[in-house]
């Protein structure tokens, strides 16, 4: 995954339908979290109807004793609510089979899917330049041909743009960020640090002073994965919701700030309608999102949020413009970016070299921030701009997959 560790791709299948509500089941290899579910409402459901539904749920939970079989510990019930852009409303929590059946009988509910484990995906005219770049990916994005050691870029370098890194956190004190990184929110544990390193590496590629594409961008840590690089799908969606609200000026819809914001998700799990709908809500709010395609060397349509068409899905390339052997592929892939043996930042002030589509995606996020800083329009349409600028050079990209490798338009 660049994704660092492997996420298991799976297609969710409809298990049953009760009064129009689908109850989905994950395939046999998904790491489902016992008794945890995400309940997604129909798009036409109003805020008032959503609140009425969750009020009913709370009252219903209070009126019954929900206990696990063979255990005296009660079920937690509803734990989080989500509202993204006025078009995606959902909640998640811990429920027994009887409660799931009751919830599914409500006409306002679109579908219910099990919560599961999500993991990292690692395995110009006024140009300035950086010689002897510490990571080959920088030189490749700034040049039409491979093999260079200089990164050519405009000195605007993403200034005035904010990048939300939805990951394991960021070492915001790393000297390469020069004070441009800050802590946002934590949705997975009580440690407001990057105890894994994945998020810091990703953020370094997006906006490090030496290691980043957008050297002037502001960075915000949104922690959704723990020290082991894993978390729940529901927790990831909660982080997506928070980031969208911040990027939209703290509100629920599109604001001027949205067009000056980018997001990176170097993570993924089995295909999830809930995750894809949340990603679409972010795109609909006018925010550009780069997403890792995954590291299973298979069609990325089986992974989320990579399979959501409105995001910019990124596969990983090698130093000689080949497809990285681990990289996912397929029609949902928008572009390739450097993802094999990428050197970037490590918590504690040092560096590390990692491989994965997790490393490719931040090249695209950083390029998105860079282009917005140059005056290009932000939002999901920025992916089309990036594709038009890209060069069709990837050798054997995979069946039905683009061969386009990102390029910053330096003219070099």
Swiss-Prot record:
Residues bearing glycans: 123, 126, 252, 264, 408
Cellular component terms per the entry's GO annotation: extracellular region
EC code(s) of this entry: 3.4.21.-
Source taxon at top rank: Eukaryota
Annotated Peptidase S8 domain residues: 135-412
The keyword Secreted belongs to this UniProt entry's keyword annotation: yes
Residue ranges of every copy of the Inhibitor I9 domain listed in the record: 36-120
Molecular functions per Gene Ontology: serine-type endopeptidase activity
Coiled coil start-end: none
Location in or out of the cell: Secreted
Entries under PANTHER family matching the protein: CEREVISIN-RELATED, PEPTIDASE S8
Its biological purpose: Secreted subtilisin-like serine protease with keratinolytic activity that contributes to pathogenicity.
Family that this chain belongs to: Belongs to the peptidase S8 family.
Protein name in UniProt: Subtilisin-like protease 6
Species, as recorded: Trichophyton rubrum
Name of the encoding gene: SUB6
